[in-house]
Amino acid sequence: MRSIKRLAKIAIFLVAGFFTWSQCYTFDVKKATTHLTEHGRNKSTHCCAWYTMRALQAGGCPAIILPAQWYKYFMPLVQFEEVASEGYSPQAGDVVVFERPKGRSWKKISGWWGHVAMYNGEQWISDFKQKRMSPYRQKVPYRLYRYRVSAKNIKT
């Protein structure tokens, strides 16, 4: 089982690297959050990764579809840096990636692949408009990411 997980991680990096190598892009937070706000629903459709990926793409990020919890490997590849959760103050465009909750059965589609969402400046949105950052009742490990502007990702 470990070897399958390891191979999956390698495949993610190779595919993500293929699509993002030498990609110079600027991420437009306003376009991404507007897209997500307009398309976010009132109830979950269990497609958080799809909706968040489409918002990232609307903002100019060369995002690909992945299971939600695997975005923790992808976000650093596309110029998003991890932000410490201690003393965290959300900013528009921030992305949160939740691990799969322990004990979650593969038979339940909800949460099996983790969860990913973006902050639009007012609330967290994935495939639905969330009441708080975490969609889970129990405490689940998560990572926060913020787009970093650098000379490398500015188009000339």
Predicted regions: what they are:
Residues 1-12:
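N-terminal Sec-pathway targeting helices
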Residues 11-14, 19, 71, 154:
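Compositionally biased non-globular segments, especially hydrophobic aliphatic-rich helices
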Residues 15-66, 111-112:
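N-terminal capping segments
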Residues 40-41, 62-136:
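...with weaker cross-activation on analogous glycine-rich loops/strands in unrelated enzymes
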Residues 143-156:
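Low-complexity, Gly/Ser/Thr/Pro-rich intrinsically disordered linker/tail segments
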Residues 138-142:
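A broad structural signal for short, well-ordered beta-strand segments within beta-sheet-rich domains
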